[in-house]
Amino acid sequence: MKSVYNFVVTPVKSRYNNTKDIGGKELIVNTEIFNHQYVSREAIVKAIPTVGDTDIKVGDKVIVHHNVFRRWHNQHGIEKNSRSYIDEETYLVQPDQIFLYKDTEWQAQKGYCFVAPVKSTDKLSVDKEKPLVGIVKHTDGTVNKGDLIGFRPSSEYEFII
């Protein structure tokens, strides 16, 4: 299967990452489909768009938007798949829904930068991290890896990579 403008991907393990292995037994930590924190974001590229230029190749691992694999309830309470859904193993992903890709090393897509938090040294603060600063871990080339940067409020979104 190929798409003209979209990537074709498959989830790495499953649509949701809501289980943990504890003592050899599987524990389900969340049963809600609407909680974005438990939606899988890792995928493997099955096909690239036929139109456009991309550094992403078939077989690369990618980090996608949480709504790609997510299920939701419509206004009538009926459970639906995302618009990316083709079948349980196949999803169409728009280029702007891919944030990172990995052949051998993680690379950020154009327009994205991934920042690790800086631990707070302020003994009077209850915050574990310094607000609005971080160290660049994955970059699109606009800033250097390892740089200490500042960013605007509400421009951050947590990813665990």
Question: Model regions: which residues?
Answer:
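Acidic-enriched and Gly/Ser
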Residues: 1-161
